[in-house]
Amino acid sequence: MDPEKDRFPRAIVWTPIPVLTWLIPCIGHMGICDSTGRSHDFVGRGVINIDRLAFGRPLLYAPVDSSILFECYDLKYDEEIHAADNHFKSQMHNLLTNNCHHHVAMCLHEPNAFAVWIMFWRNARLAPNRVR
């Protein structure tokens, strides 16, 4: 983990969305980090950010539960993220049914994006680079 460079290997990261998060604090933008800590997030049709979240630096992160990781660990984990990236590059973004949370859920083979959201909030920690 390298908080200064926003690197959180095998973790889900979250950042607030200006105005929206101020009104509803549990709503924000989510991404997933590969085995090297680079973040991947779905922003819209044809747009997958790598190593940069759409709304700024991660405020919270949650390590991915090792019980849901794959046997081949890093290689398979990274392949699943890239597969989800390729799938979502052709998808339209929809605030309720096809968004950054669904991208993370697909990376983890979790059919229910809400389950990923719950897992994140149960395990979220303040990113060390934000504690000052």
Located regions from the model:
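Juxtamembrane amphipathic/hinge helix adjacent to a transmembrane helix
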Residues: C100-R132
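Non-catalytic ligand/cofactor/substrate-binding and regulatory segments of enzyme domains
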Residues: M1-W14, P18, I24-I27, I32-N98, ...
